[in-house]
């Protein structure tokens, strides 16, 4: 299913969020300026497409942390045990991670939206404000705070504290992540090597 994204039909511009918290933030900022949310696969071949890209491993962990928050909320009488059980389940069956709503490949998300042979302008996740300026021509100083892991419940924060079993090298599931999201890594590594703030991908 095509993920929702934002378009401005007057400027023929589209912005593709690649994470749930980024999606909420972009909707908050752009809907005030006449942008609309759509799931139309190809609104127009003459749109200019923008997105931000995140380190695939950091994005995976961020998505799993949000999933763990739901586990926590549903098991308040046994939070540590429930969180540990979920981590063990993912460790033993990594493919179950792929079926989660927010772990879809960034590449797959974009290729499902951007028309064939159309260019996508990609910024690093840390440059989301620069991407917004490029897409809108406006500075946005009213962006809401993005979700940060420090705000999560203690049992989830503890999993990723320095020295835990999940933060030791090699990082938990990092090899599987690189294999499963290899195309995401290809784009991310091109961004890291670029001498410009953004790169252009063609699908």
Question: What role is predicted for each listed range?
Answer:
Residues 15-16, 20, 122:
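Short, charged/polar micro-motifs that form catalytic or ligand-binding hotspots
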Residues 4-7, 36-53, 57-202:
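PAPS-dependent sulfotransferase catalytic domain
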Residues 18-30, 55-58:
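Catalytic nucleophile-elbow at a beta strand-turn-alpha helix junction centered on a G-D-S/GDSL motif
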Residues 4-17:
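Extended, structured, electrostatic nucleic-acid-contact surfaces
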């Amino acid at each position: 299913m095509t993920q929702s994204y934002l378009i401005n039909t007057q400027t023929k511009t589209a912005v593709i969020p690649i994470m749930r918290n980024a999606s909420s933030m972009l909707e908050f900022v752009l809907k005030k300026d006449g942008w609309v949310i759509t799931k139309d696969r190809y609104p127009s071949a003459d749109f200019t497409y923008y997105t931000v890209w995140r380190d695939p491993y950091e994005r995976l962990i961020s998505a799993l942390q949000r999933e763990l928050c739901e586990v926590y909320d549903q098991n308040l009488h046994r939070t540590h045990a429930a969180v540990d059980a979920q981590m063990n389940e993912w460790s033993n069956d990594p493919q179950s991670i792929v079926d989660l709503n927010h772990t879809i490949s960034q590449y797959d998300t974009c290729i499902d939206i951007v028309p064939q042979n159309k260019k996508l302008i990609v910024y690093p996740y840390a440059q989301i404000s620069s991407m917004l300026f490029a897409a809108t021509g406006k500075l946005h100083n009213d962006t809401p705070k993005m979700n940060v892991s420090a705000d999560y419940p203690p049992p989830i924060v503890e999993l990723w504290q320095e020295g835990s079993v999940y933060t030791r090298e090699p990082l938990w599931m990092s090899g599987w992540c690189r294999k499963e999201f290899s195309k995401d890594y290809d784009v991310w590594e091109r961004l890291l090597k670029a001498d410009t703030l953004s790169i252009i991908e063609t699908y």
